[in-house]
């Protein structure tokens, strides 16, 4: 009996040493306001604007949009299956000018799991095959010596593995090996926090599903490595990397308990930073909101292994319309210094305008041209003054003197007197 008591005491001590990443509840009105930002996006049902992440975020949140959710999922199924399957063996894309990427396909598979569905039947098999072909193609691009790079990114590579895992679809060890190699400390290049977090979520799903048993030890070590790297990336304010990579980082950390108090302390600090960012209105982008809402409901993408589709959720009501006040005119300087001849022009716009509004006004005034492409996180620049971003290049937004902007052209709202620079950079 004495030995049993000692054993139970030891178990209690070990349990006390294990810390979970827990985010205390936030003000429900603040969370509801966040969810209300997604409602207008759910009325945009064209293929270009459909975003599976919005559906996933709502289903894993404490909020619901009622019949809007059903219509949105129906539109996702119609659009994605028509474009991805209708042209799977044909060069003719028909009306699918904005054919979904493989990253979008992976998120679509997450959306199905968020509705407690598995891909099944002939159509489902073809979708799975397309995602597996994508991973194989990326694997070849990385190369057997790991000196190459994915055509897209390791973020999309990890997302693809996660999506297949959630649907109980196995991928070959050689596919997992590329992601393992990318995060292992003795091979590790520089990866952003959200890329590391997505890889960590993929590894966590593989481990919990008992997939790739021959890689189990490496997967366990990779989860530990990712956790350590994310914790190291915490800023003095409390964000992991930056404010917009913090939600996905928290999703991973919430699935990855560790001994000691470091994890719990870091997550509480992140919660304080997130609260301040929410109160400042930092979260306006639909993709970022959809990654944060599950965290505020103590959920992660890993919950899609066994989703709870009957959990009670509060009905969202549209935000009350505010009567616009008379807006002042502000002056924003737009400059492009990485091209010859350089461009620099003062642009007058309404206060509250986005960078995209500034670009449109500059184009209307003449002497400035640009092109954009839609993505799940919003439009991004593909060409400025006739100069297209090449492979492994992108047009970066900076606030003068030299501060990279974390938000995209449709989200950042410059203040009066600010200078916005568009700079072509390599990565």
From Swiss-Prot:
Listed PROSITE patterns: COBALAMIN_BINDING
GO biological process: cobalamin transport; cobalt ion transport
Subcellular location: Secreted
GO molecular-function term, one example from the UniProt record: cargo receptor ligand activity
Disulphide bridges: 21-267, 83-96, 116-309, 165-205
Family matches, as PANTHER family: TRANSCOBALAMIN-1/GASTRIC INTRINSIC FACTOR, TRANSCOBALAMIN-2
UniProt function note: Primary vitamin B12-binding and transport protein. Delivers cobalamin to cells.
Protein name, per record: Transcobalamin-2
